């Protein structure tokens, strides 16, 4: 029995583990032992005082335990619930226009270039490498309208070991850049091909997601057909909603027969318990209630909302309505690919709402940490698999070293009281970057540093 149990154990760590639960936004577990099976599952997380008991049960020796230094800690992998992979080509630039003008001047012309699979291969390889290196273990990607390029994105995410949803964008309306759209029939047919080929690949951690860009770029026929495809294959759906005021007015003008923006998606089979909608800055009480009833999720993208002067999402109000919510970078409307940036911006936006007396309190850093990990996993329907270090979940994790070479963080004697203090964790969340993320694990497999095969 001992030999059989031993074969199941692949990794054993001893040190500090920081994660969230639904009752505690940030739990710091000092001097704990965590074991990972060869299938990548967490099989135990207990105080180190239980080492002898665990060693007997799992048949390991003390020399097989990897001991973290007193300033290192593990945290769950970050979950980016909304990112446009092709827009990484111009991330960090061109955030000088409001949403609709920005789409027409920068985004659509850039995405049109992805009809070239060579362009797709270069940009998608770089964005997956960059996001993984910055701790994004799970990403919900928009591709472009090009099926073959979107399939390349899925292939690359699988090759690098990132957990992901990948969507082929659908749009049969685009009067301003007419060369970047499909016919309704093409969009439906190509989405079916994309889904079929993705499912045939049977990737272990990369799944297709139905992706109507937003109501302004999709006819009712297309939206309804996409809803049917999602239902037939039991797939997740992603899109945008209520990002800025001009967009909302345009939706009212295009679809006057609906009660509101949410109703457009709801009546066309696109608002389900497998839907994640980006932004939602201006959703009404009625709309939030519908989101809650349907079980749909929101991806909060604070960098993009600020950079394009779109709006300020009231996360506390969303949570009050019991709507699932995670964080997104929204590259490239959000100029940063880092989920640490999303954490910081989410705190700042909440502080602004407090300053303006919209709310009587603001989100804490700990609460936003939960949004970026466990909250994001719930928004994408993965909270039974990832999001924290509960036994039975996959080991998606980041090894954080605040004292890494050339670290942007300075630590002082007062930051340590025996073991790592919460001040060190806060310093990483506010000041840290990829230099502090020494190792990245997805499903128990170390994916950063990168292997020579990718």
UniProtKB/Swiss-Prot annotation:
Residues reported to bind substrate: 84-87, 213-214, 240-243, 330
UniProt-annotated binding residues for Zn(2+): 82, 84, 240, 330
Gene Ontology CC terms: cytosol; postsynapse; postsynaptic cytosol; presynaptic cytosol
GO biological process: allantoin metabolic process; amide catabolic process; deoxyguanosine catabolic process; dGMP catabolic process; GMP catabolic process; guanine catabolic process; guanine metabolic process; positive regulation of microtubule polymerization
Pathway membership, UniProt: Purine metabolism; guanine degradation; xanthine from guanine: step 1/1
Catalytic activity: guanine + H2O + H(+) = xanthine + NH4(+)
Co-factor: note: Binds 1 zinc ion per subunit.
Cofactors, names only: Zn(2+)
Pfam family membership, one: Amidohydro_1
Alphabetic keyword roster: Hydrolase, Metal-binding, Phosphoprotein, Zinc
Key word tRNA-binding present: no
Modified sites of kind Phosphoserine: 453
Molecular-function GO term, any one: zinc ion binding
Function: Catalyzes the hydrolytic deamination of guanine, producing xanthine and ammonia.
Similarity comment: Belongs to the metallo-dependent hydrolases superfamily. ATZ/TRZ family.
Subunit composition and interactions: Homodimer.
Protein name per the record: Guanine deaminase
Gene source species: Rattus norvegicus
């Amino acid at each position: 029995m001992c030999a059989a149990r031993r074969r199941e154990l692949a990794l054993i760590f001893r040190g500090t583990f920081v994660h969230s639960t639904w009752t505690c936004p940030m739990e710091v577990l000092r001097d704990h032992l965590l074991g990972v099976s060869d299938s990548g599952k967490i099989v135990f997380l207990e105080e180190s005082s239980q080492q002898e008991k665990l060693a007997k049960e799992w048949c390991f020796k003390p020399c097989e335990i990897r001991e973290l230094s007193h300033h290192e800690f593990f945290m769950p992998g970050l979950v980016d619930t909304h990112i446009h992979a092709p827009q990484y080509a111009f991330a960090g630039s061109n955030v000088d226009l409001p949403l609709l003008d920005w789409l027409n001047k920068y985004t659509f012309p850039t995405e049109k270039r992805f009809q070239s699979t060579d362009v797709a291969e270069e940009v998608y390889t770089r964005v997956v490498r960059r996001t993984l290196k910055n701790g994004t273990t799970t990403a919900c990607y928009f591709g472009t309208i090009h099926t073959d390029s979107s399939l390349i994105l899925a292939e690359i995410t699988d090759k690098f070991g990132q957990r992901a949803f990948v969507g082929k964008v659908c749009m049969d309306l685009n009067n301003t850049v007419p060369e970047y759209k499909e016919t309704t029939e093409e969009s439906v047919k190509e989405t079916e091909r994309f889904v079929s080929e993705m499912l045939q690949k049977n990737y272990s951690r990369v799944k297709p997601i139905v992706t109507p860009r937003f109501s302004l770029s999709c006819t009712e026929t297309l939206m309804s057909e996409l809803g049917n495809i999602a239902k037939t294959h039991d797939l997740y759906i992603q899109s945008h909603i209520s990002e800025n005021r001009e967009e909302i007015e345009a939706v009212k003008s295009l679809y006057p027969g609906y009660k509101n923006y949410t109703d457009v998606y709801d009546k066309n089979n696109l608002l389900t318990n497998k839907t994640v909608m980006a932004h939602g800055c201006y959703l009404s009480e009625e709309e939030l209630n519908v989101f809650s009833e349907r079980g749909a999720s929101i991806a909060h993208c604070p960098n993009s909302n600020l950079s394009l002067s779109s709006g300020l999402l009231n996360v506390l109000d969303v949570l009050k309505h019991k709507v699932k919510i995670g964080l997104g970078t929204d590259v490239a409307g959000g100029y940063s690919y880092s989920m640490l940036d999303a954490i910081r911006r989410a705190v700042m936006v909440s502080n602004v709402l407090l300053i303006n007396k919209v709310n009587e309190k603001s989100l804490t850093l700990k609460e936003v940490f939960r949004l970026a990990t466990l909250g994001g996993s719930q928004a994408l329907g993965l909270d039974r698999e990832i999001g924290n270090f509960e036994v039975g979940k996959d080991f998606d994790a980041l090894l954080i070293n605040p004292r890494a070479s050339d670290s942007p963080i300075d630590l002082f004697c007062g930051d340590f009281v025996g073991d790592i203090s919460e001040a060190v964790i806060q310093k990483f969340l506010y000041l840290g970057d990829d230099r502090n993320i020494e190792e990245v694990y997805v499903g128990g497999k170390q994916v950063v540093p990168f292997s020579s095969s990718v």
